[in-house]
C-alpha cells in the first residue's frame, strides 16, 4: 500500500473482498469510521486524496479510489518529519511537486481552485525542499512542505495526474523504484515531450518561483 493510511481504510470499507476486487474507481462504496491522517512525509498527499495505491504479488501497481478513503481530518505536525533522511525528504518532496505540476497542466477537471493550490505548492516546494534536505530539523521548512504536499494532493485529487505518474507506477511496480525518485527522473522528460501543449501552463508556474 502507498501509505499506512491506505491499508486500514480500505480494509474497513470492504473486509470480505480482496484488494484486487476493489481496483479502480468507486468500488468500495461504503461509509467507514471517520479517521484522522497524520503524515510523516511530505509527498504522497494521502491525507487528502481518494486513492490507496497497491502493488500486488505480480508487481502490478494500481489504485483503489473511492471518496470514502479521504480522511476526515489531516494533522500536519512538522516534528514528526524531522528524522526523515535527506534522500527520502527529497524523493517525497519531488512526488508532491509532480502532483502539483501534473494537476496544473492537466485538462481533466482543472479549476481555478486546483490551479491556485498547485501554484502555491510548487512555490513552497522550490523554496523549502532544499532547506529541509540540508537541515531536517528546520520546523518551518518541514511545515511548509507538509502544507505543500496537502495542497498538491487536494489539487490532483480533483484535476488528476498524468503520464509521469502512469510511467512511475509501472517502474515502481516492476522494479521497486521509489515512487518519488521515478517521478523526479520522468517529470522533465515528459514535460519536454509535451512540447508546446504544456508551455503556457509551465510558464505560468515558472512565474511563481
Language model segments and positions:
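A general structural signal for well-ordered alpha-helical segments in protein cores
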Residues: 94, 122, 164, 183-184, ...
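Carboxylate- and glycine-rich phosphate/diphosphate-binding segment that chelates Mg2+/Mn2+
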Residues: 51-159
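Glycine/threonine-rich beta-strand-loop-alpha-helix active-site module
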Residues: 1-79
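Gly/Pro-rich interdomain helix-loop hinge
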Residues: 174-209
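Glycine-rich phosphate/pyrophosphate-binding beta-alpha loops
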Residues: 43, 150-183
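Buried hydrophobic packing segments
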Residues: 4-11, 100-101, 125-128, 149-153, ...
Amino acid at each position: 500500500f502507498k501509505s499506512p493510511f491506505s491499508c486500514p481504510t480500505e480494509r474497513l470499507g470492504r473486509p470480505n473482498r480482496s484488494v484486487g476486487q476493489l481496483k479502480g474507481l468507486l468500488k468500495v462504496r461504503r461509509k467507514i469510521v471517520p479517521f484522522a491522517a497524520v503524515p510523516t512525509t511530505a509527498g504522497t498527499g494521502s491525507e487528502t486524496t481518494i486513492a490507496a495505491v497497491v502493488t500486488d504479488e505480480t508487481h502490478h501497481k494500481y489504485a483503489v479510489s473511492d471518496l470514502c478513503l479521504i480522511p476526515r481530518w489531516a494533522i500536519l505536525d512538522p516534528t514528526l518529519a524531522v528524522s526523515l533522511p535527506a534522500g527520502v525528504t527529497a524523493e517525497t518532496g519531488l512526488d508532491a511537486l509532480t502532483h502539483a505540476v501534473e494537476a496544473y497542466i492537466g485538462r481533466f477537471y482543472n479549476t481555478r481552485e486546483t490551479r491556485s493550490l498547485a501554484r502555491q505548492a510548487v512555490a513552497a516546494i522550490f523554496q523549502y525542499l532544499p532547506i529541509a534536505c540540508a537541515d531536517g530539523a528546520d520546523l518551518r521548512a518541514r511545515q511548509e512542505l507538509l502544507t505543500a504536499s496537502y495542497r498538491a494532493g487536494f489539487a490532483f485529487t480533483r484535476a488528476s495526474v498524468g503520464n509521469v505518474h502512469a510511467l512511475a507506477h509501472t517502474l515502481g511496480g516492476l522494479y521497486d523504484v521509489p515512487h518519488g525518485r521515478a517521478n523526479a527522473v520522468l517529470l522533465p522528460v515528459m514535460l519536454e515531450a509535451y512540447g508546446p501543449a504544456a508551455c503556457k501552463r509551465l510558464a505560468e508556474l515558472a512565474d511563481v518561483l
